């Protein structure tokens, strides 16, 4: 649970390019906000400062079990599928059941967290960029892994040896992405650069305390 100024969910719609004030092409990612709302609001005291623990959620969930349904019913909010909890010192901006306003992100540097594209089971060359063997006639070790350790001593394979396996679908975060534009009517905003994952991927966009407005 991190201490941030603002946090919301987003959905990656795709990438395009726009022109800045100097006529340069800037690659941007179009992100939509899936109407997240505040679920819980708990006030704690730390170093004589009032700190809020906020829980937000998005997307309706019809498969929730009874304890979860009871939890949402107690908070007077609909059943939500994706939840996230964060801490903030802004006491008056988060009310239970209210949606989050995107104007907080305009011209700010944000951190985006998401899952990368899953590529399935991959070999040594694709996953770890290993060099392959000779491709000439007579060679039998084109893409084989080779040795993975010694023999009798130590008689085992050490943990952490790079081998073939699943590639992708890892949680990754990118810091200091600039929010170029915010469309409050359509709940869209433009991020400079790329973000992890495929189109339609759920993103977690957070605004840190160290960020500042850019002129």
Curated annotation (Swiss-Prot):
InterPro entries: Ribosomal_uL3, Ribosomal_uL3_bac/org-type, Transl_B-barrel_sf
Keywords: Chloroplast, Plastid, Ribonucleoprotein, Ribosomal protein, RNA-binding, rRNA-binding
Region (Disordered): 132-151
Highest taxon of source: Eukaryota
Spans traversing the lipid bilayer: none
GO cellular component: chloroplast; cytosolic large ribosomal subunit
SUPFAM superfamilies attached to this UniProt entry: Translation proteins (SSF50447)
Subcellular location: Plastid, Chloroplast
Predominant location category: plastid
Biological processes per GO annotation: translation
Molecular function terms from GO: rRNA binding; structural constituent of ribosome
Function: One of the primary rRNA binding proteins, it binds directly near the 3'-end of the 23S rRNA, where it nucleates assembly of the 50S subunit.
Assembly and oligomerization: Part of the 50S ribosomal subunit.
PANTHER family in the cross-refs: 50S RIBOSOMAL PROTEIN L3, LARGE RIBOSOMAL SUBUNIT PROTEIN UL3C
Record-given protein name: Large ribosomal subunit protein uL3c
Organism of this sequence: Cyanidium caldarium
Gene giving rise to this polypeptide: rpl3
């Amino acid at each position: 649970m991190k201490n941030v100024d603002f946090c919301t969910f987003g959905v990656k719609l795709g990438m395009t390019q726009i022109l800045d004030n100097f006529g340069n092409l800037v690659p941007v990612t179009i992100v939509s906000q899936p109407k997240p709302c505040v679920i819980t609001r708990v006030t704690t005291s730390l170093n004589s400062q009032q700190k809020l623990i906020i829980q937000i959620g998005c997307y309706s969930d019809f498969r929730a079990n009874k304890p979860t349904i009871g939890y949402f019913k107690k908070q007077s909010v609909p059943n939500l599928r994706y939840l996230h909890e964060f801490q903030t010192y802004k006491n008056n901006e988060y009310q239970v059941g209210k949606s989050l306003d995107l104007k907080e992100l305009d011209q700010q540097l944000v951190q985006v967290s998401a899952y990368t594209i899953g590529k399935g089971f991959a070999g040594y060359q694709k996953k770890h960029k290993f060099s392959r063997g000779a491709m000439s006639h007579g060679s039998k070790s084109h893409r084989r892994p080779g040795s993975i350790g010694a023999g009798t001593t130590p008689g085992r394979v050490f943990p952490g040896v790079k081998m073939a396996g699943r590639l992708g679908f890892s949680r990754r975060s990118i810091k200091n992405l600039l929010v170029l534009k915010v469309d409050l009517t359509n709940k869209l905003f433009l991020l400079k650069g790329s973000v992890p994952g495929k189109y339609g991927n759920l993103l977690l966009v957070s605004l840190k305390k160290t960020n500042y407005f850019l002129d």
